[in-house]
Amino acid sequence: MSDLVFYDVASTGANGFDPDAGYMAFCVKYAESVNLAAVRIFFLNAAKAKAALSRKPERKANPKFGEWQVEVVNNHFPGNRNNPINSDDLTIHRLSGYLARWVLEQYKENEDESRRELIKTTIINPIAESNGVRWDSGAEIYLSFFPGTEMFLETFKFYPLTIGIYRVKQGMMDPQYLKKALRQRYGSLTADKWMSQKVTAIAKSLKEVEQLKWGRGGLSDTARSFLQKFGIRLP
């Protein structure tokens, strides 16, 4: 009869994970140690960190970004991908979303223009920049290009979702990558609720995304003006 006895197993997903609670716990633990310099280094090296972790079998790792060290669950190594992730665990993806929200809050809570300028010159979003989107498009839009921001659809005004929708429509991204955003809450609304109640807000957000100067990454406005003198007009 032993072959008919079954036991519960740990979930391999993050079912029941509350991003807002996770973010608050992150802030409590790291508020005194995290700073703009460390966040800049993280975002510029997140892809490299993922690649390095994919070669290490350890379940947890302690990458260091400048002087800031943080423990993360290593779900990038092929043999670790089905390991359970607890609600209070950090992954590179969660860390990306948390730090993007932290930067946005730092930016919005500081009315001092010199402080805001420091944030804008320190924090670089390589994904946004490669698509020609910069800080002057708006803090929420610029930061929404960071992975993990889809956990906070209300905070980022649906931009993580609508940026994804635009990229799918333009053939820049596979539709499967929208799944994470489509499972998230919007404030207290579950996905099935906001999909029916927030259509107008999502359409407005998408329209703003469509009006961005996409595809202008890599060349400054000065360089573009120079090329125009020789009859070369870039999109």
Curated annotation (Swiss-Prot):
<dbReference type="InterPro" id="IPR001784">
    <property type="entry name" value="Bunya_nucleocap"/>
</dbReference>
<feature type="binding site">
    <location>
        <position position="185"/>
    </location>
    <ligand>
        <name>RNA</name>
    </ligand>
</feature>
<feature type="binding site">
    <location>
        <position position="177"/>
    </location>
    <ligand>
        <name>RNA</name>
    </ligand>
</feature>
<keyword id="KW-0543">Viral nucleoprotein</keyword>
<feature type="binding site">
    <location>
        <position position="81"/>
    </location>
    <ligand>
        <name>RNA</name>
    </ligand>
</feature>
<dbReference type="GO" id="GO:0019029">
    <property type="term" value="C:helical viral capsid"/>
</dbReference>
<feature type="binding site">
    <location>
        <position position="75"/>
    </location>
    <ligand>
        <name>RNA</name>
    </ligand>
</feature>
<feature type="binding site">
    <location>
        <position position="129"/>
    </location>
    <ligand>
        <name>RNA</name>
    </ligand>
</feature>
<keyword id="KW-0687">Ribonucleoprotein</keyword>
<feature type="binding site">
    <location>
        <position position="124"/>
    </location>
    <ligand>
        <name>RNA</name>
    </ligand>
</feature>
<feature type="binding site">
    <location>
        <position position="184"/>
    </location>
    <ligand>
        <name>RNA</name>
    </ligand>
</feature>
<feature type="binding site">
    <location>
        <position position="183"/>
    </location>
    <ligand>
        <name>RNA</name>
    </ligand>
</feature>
<keyword id="KW-0945">Host-virus interaction</keyword>
<keyword id="KW-1190">Host gene expression shutoff by virus</keyword>
<dbReference type="GO" id="GO:1990904">
    <property type="term" value="C:ribonucleoprotein complex"/>
</dbReference>
<feature type="binding site">
    <location>
        <position position="18"/>
    </location>
    <ligand>
        <name>RNA</name>
    </ligand>
</feature>
<feature type="binding site">
    <location>
        <position position="126"/>
    </location>
    <ligand>
        <name>RNA</name>
    </ligand>
</feature>
<feature type="binding site">
    <location>
        <position position="76"/>
    </location>
    <ligand>
        <name>RNA</name>
    </ligand>
</feature>
<comment type="function">
    <text>Encapsidates the genome protecting it from nucleases. The encapsidated genomic RNA is termed the nucleocapsid (NC) and serves as template for transcription and replication. The NC have a helical organization. Seems to participate in the nuclear relocalization of host PABP1, thereby inhibiting host cellular translation.</text>
</comment>
<dbReference type="GO" id="GO:0039657">
    <property type="term" value="P:symbiont-mediated suppression of host gene expression"/>
</dbReference>
<feature type="binding site">
    <location>
        <position position="167"/>
    </location>
    <ligand>
        <name>RNA</name>
    </ligand>
</feature>
<keyword id="KW-1193">Eukaryotic host translation shutoff by virus</keyword>
<keyword id="KW-1139">Helical capsid protein</keyword>
<comment type="similarity">
    <text>Belongs to the orthobunyavirus nucleocapsid protein family.</text>
</comment>
<keyword id="KW-0167">Capsid protein</keyword>
<feature type="binding site">
    <location>
        <position position="47"/>
    </location>
    <ligand>
        <name>RNA</name>
    </ligand>
</feature>
<comment type="subunit">
    <text>Homotetramer. Binds the viral genomic RNA. Interacts with host PABP1.</text>
</comment>
<keyword id="KW-0694">RNA-binding</keyword>
<keyword id="KW-1262">Eukaryotic host gene expression shutoff by virus</keyword>
<keyword id="KW-0946">Virion</keyword>
<feature type="binding site">
    <location>
        <position position="94"/>
    </location>
    <ligand>
        <name>RNA</name>
    </ligand>
</feature>
<dbReference type="Pfam" id="PF00952">
    <property type="entry name" value="Bunya_nucleocap"/>
</dbReference>
<dbReference type="GO" id="GO:0019013">
    <property type="term" value="C:viral nucleocapsid"/>
</dbReference>
<protein>
    <recommendedName>
        <fullName>Nucleoprotein</fullName>
    </recommendedName>
</protein>
<dbReference type="InterPro" id="IPR043011">
    <property type="entry name" value="Bunya_nucleocap_C"/>
</dbReference>
<dbReference type="InterPro" id="IPR043012">
    <property type="entry name" value="Bunya_nucleocap_N"/>
</dbReference>
<feature type="binding site">
    <location>
        <position position="50"/>
    </location>
    <ligand>
        <name>RNA</name>
    </ligand>
</feature>
<dbReference type="GO" id="GO:0003723">
    <property type="term" value="F:RNA binding"/>
</dbReference>
